[in-house]
């Protein structure tokens, strides 16, 4: 009974709302009357939902009419009366729309009074806008998109000011009106569905699926919790041990000052306590700690990372049967096979095991990149099944994460064309688009593919996508900005940007202030690159780009500040710097700087789960698809020291985001181990120390490195890396 009383008002409100919706007028009157007689509270709005108004269409028309006529008071009275405060105050899209609506009414007289606005009314509108900026609109003052408009009330003639040129274009008001109409349609459409009906529809199958997902998430969370608890207990024990040893060492130092000697036995006991468990027994009686330097040398040696153990090769597979089932099998089988093939690559040990897996895929043409048949494995990118499309995109992205995999995929331009088509068409599944975008971004490390993407107009598509960065996932945002930067480093790409210079500069300036700081190196690199074009420099000066950049100098860290200073210097230069423009004539590949990365995102948020008795993963492959001698080894390429970059300068070389977001770094050939890969599914692998990249020069190509989050933030304008110990293969 207590639960009923606690929610009585909302429950009665649900009934009242449905009776009103179904037009049970007499029943509704009787119900309301009886509730009043019994003193039962009636919730006016259910669950904070929108006001239910039978005249919602009329309200929409009145709002649009007030917008068209410039009736500011009527518009905002209707706006505040019929759009719930829960949406106006918390929804970012509603807040942005309201900001632009205030601008619309503030400049309405300037646009539609024939050049002779009523001065008193104009001052009142500007004053109203200023009050809004100082109160409710103050929350958006940290957003780059709106920053210039805070100066609007103080500009004598906004119509001629370059920062506000866009507001007075003929297309600005119709575009804003269209956004308003879409917003109102969405809001009032939601208001017309009674919550009782929604609850009824959602009951049943949706709840069952959600319970299964929650159960799976609970199991994974419990596994992670156990792993973290063990790690925590070990760290706590090590910490207590260190504190104890430290206290003893302090006592020993004090004793030494008093003239007492430290015995070799005591020194040996302290060192053994500090060594790893594996070394304690062997060292206790075999090392002479009386020799000077022995103890410190052994301590440092105990901290060295363990060498990777030799691991066996994975069993050979029957690739003919695999490809046949990938083409003709059921959608569920296709999805499980694609998942298993990806896992075989992502969870294999770096080194010979992973290289053998990759070479087997390539030598058996797993994706039919060289096939001319009408039906091929590649066609799965256009499957009607969402799971198959997504898992195919994940596998392609995994292959593109490795240099040899990129070379395999790049040999046929149809792979690039299919990925570009999937990228532009995929609007249902976010993860599919993320993986397609990730693969294309890694493709952009190779010059011929850069050229093809530029010719295909991908730069324009990326600019359009990045106009609304808040609607994008972190992965999509980072990889799209990094891809845009890589394409902008080519002279052909810069010339493409010059065709839409104003829009390109606006998008990049908005991204400078985005809350995702991982994109800053790519934004800075793109800006620095395109500002080598005189026409883009002129456009940037006209829009006050230097003032915008200096705003960020006040808030940025040291590396960010130095990078922005480089960009400002480029902006104010008159002549092109030597070597800035890179020739497009040479399309030869330089694979010496094409590196490997296997980020944990490849295996995140798995869409399918095996049912009881259903095979998946490596067990599916080795049970149903064992082959004979299909693994073909290949001599491993040995690397040289990587070309490095300086955190003081903007990026000038093609890169890929790699492990910036996940914080799972890669060092040289030591990619994520199988143990770390498994941990990556439950969280994040142990970080491996990374080398800091140092000094990229213009005109070379295909470097990709990777850094830990800390190293990225300490070099925010430095090059994002695909493999931090990036090595040049001979």
From Swiss-Prot:
UniProt signal peptide: none
Role of this protein: Involved in ciliogenesis. It is required for appropriate acetylation and polyglutamylation of ciliary microtubules, and regulation of cilium length. Acts as a positive regulator of hedgehog (Hh)signaling. May participate in the trafficking and/or retention of GLI2 and GLI3 proteins at the ciliary tip.
UniProtKB keywords: Cell projection, Cilium biogenesis/degradation, Coiled coil, Cytoplasm, Cytoskeleton, Phosphoprotein
Domain spans labelled LisH: 7-39
SUPFAM superfamilies, sorted: ARM repeat
Subcellular location field: Cytoplasm, Cytoskeleton, Cilium basal body; Cell projection, Cilium; Cytoplasm, Cytoskeleton, Microtubule organizing center, Centrosome, Centriole
Residue positions, PTM Phosphoserine: 583
One annotated Gene Ontology cellular component of this protein: cilium
Protein name stated in the entry: LisH domain-containing protein ARMC9
Hydrolase among keywords: no
């Amino acid at each position: 009974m207590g639960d009923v009383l606690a929610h009585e008002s909302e429950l009665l409100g649900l009934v009242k709302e449905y009776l009103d919706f179904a037009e049970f007028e007499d029943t509704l009157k009787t119900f309301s009357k009886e509730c009043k007689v019994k003193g039962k509270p009636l919730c006016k709005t259910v669950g904070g939902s929108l006001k239910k108004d039978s005249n919602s269409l009329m309200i929409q028309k009145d709002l649009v009419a007030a917008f068209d006529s410039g009736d500011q008071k009527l518009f905002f009275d209707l706006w505040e009366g019929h759009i719930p405060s829960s949406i106006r105050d918390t929804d970012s899209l509603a807040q942005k729309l309201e900001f632009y609506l205030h601008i619309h009414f503030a400049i309405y007289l300037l646009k539609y009074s024939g050049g002779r606005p009523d001065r008193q009314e104009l001052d009142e509108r500007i004053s109203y806008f200023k009050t809004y900026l100082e109160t409710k609109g103050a929350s958006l003052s940290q957003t780059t998109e709106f920053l210039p408009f805070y100066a609007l009330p103080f500009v004598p003639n906004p119509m001629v000011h370059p920062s506000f040129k866009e507001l007075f274009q003929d297309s600005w008001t119709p575009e804003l009106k269209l956004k308003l109409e879409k917003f109102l349609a969405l809001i009032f459409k939601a208001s017309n569905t009674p919550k009782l009906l929604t609850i009824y529809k959602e009951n049943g199958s949706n709840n069952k699926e959600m319970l299964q997902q929650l159960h799976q998430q609970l199991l994974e969370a419990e596994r992670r919790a156990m792993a973290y608890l063990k790690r925590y207990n070990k760290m706590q024990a090590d910490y207590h041990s260190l504190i104890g040893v430290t206290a003893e060492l302090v006592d020993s130092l004090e004793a030494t000052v008093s003239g007492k000697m430290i015995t070799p036995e005591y020194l040996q006991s302290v060192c053994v306590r500090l060594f790893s468990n594996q070394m304690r027994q062997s060292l206790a009686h075999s090392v002479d700690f009386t020799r000077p330097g022995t103890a410190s040398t052994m301590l440092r040696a105990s901290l060295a990372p363990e060498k990777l153990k030799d691991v066996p090769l994975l069993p050979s597979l029957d690739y003919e049967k695999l490809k046949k089932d990938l083409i003709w099998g059921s959608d569920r089988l296709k999805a499980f096979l694609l998942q298993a093939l990806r896992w075989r690559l992502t969870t294999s040990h770096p080194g010979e095991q992973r290289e053998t897996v990759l070479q087997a895929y390539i030598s058996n043409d797993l994706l039919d990149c060289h096939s001319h048949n009408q039906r091929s494995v590649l066609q799965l990118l256009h499957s009607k099944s969402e799971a198959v499309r997504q898992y195919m995109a994940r596998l392609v992205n995994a292959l593109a994460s490795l240099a040899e995999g990129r070379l395999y995929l790049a040999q046929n331009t149809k792979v690039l064309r299919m990925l570009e088509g999937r990228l532009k068409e995929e609007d249902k599944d976010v993860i599919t688009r993320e993986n397609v975008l990730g693969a294309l971004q890694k493709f952009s490390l190779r010059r011929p593919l850069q050229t093809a993407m530029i010719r295909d107009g991908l730069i324009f598509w990326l600019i359009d996508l990045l106009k609304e960065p808040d609607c994008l996932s972190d992965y999509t945002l980072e990889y799209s900005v990094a891809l845009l930067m890589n394409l902008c480093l080519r002279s052909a790409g810069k010339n493409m940007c010059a065709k839409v210079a104003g829009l390109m500069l606006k998008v990049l300036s908005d991204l400078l202030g985005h809350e995702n700081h991982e994109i800053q190196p790519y934004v800075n690199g793109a800006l620095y690159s395109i500002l080598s074009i005189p026409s883009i420099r002129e456009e940037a000066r006209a829009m006050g780009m230097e003032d915008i950049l200096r705003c960020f100098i006040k808030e940025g860290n040291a590396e960010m500040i130095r990078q922005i200073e480089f960009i400002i210097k480029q902006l104010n230069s008159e002549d092109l710097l030597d070597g800035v423009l890179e020739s497009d004539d040479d399309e030869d590949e330089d694979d010496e700087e094409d590196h490997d990365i296997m980020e944990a995102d490849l295996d995140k948020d798995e869409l399918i789960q095996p049912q009881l008795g259903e095979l998946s993963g490596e067990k599916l492959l080795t049970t149903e698809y064992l082959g004979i001698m299909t693994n073909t080894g290949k001599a491993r390429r040995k690397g040289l020291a990587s070309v490095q970059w300086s955190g003081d300068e903007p990026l000038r070389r093609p890169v890929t985001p790699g492990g910036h977001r996940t914080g799972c770094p890669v060092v040289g050939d030591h990619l994520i181990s199988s143990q770390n890969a498994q941990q990556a599914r439950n969280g994040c692998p142990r970080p491996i120390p990374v080398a800091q990249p140092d000094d990229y020069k213009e005109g070379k190509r295909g470097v990709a490195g990777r850094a830990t989050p800390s190293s990225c933030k300490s070099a925010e304008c430095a090059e994002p890396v695909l493999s931090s110990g990036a090595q040049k293969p001979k």
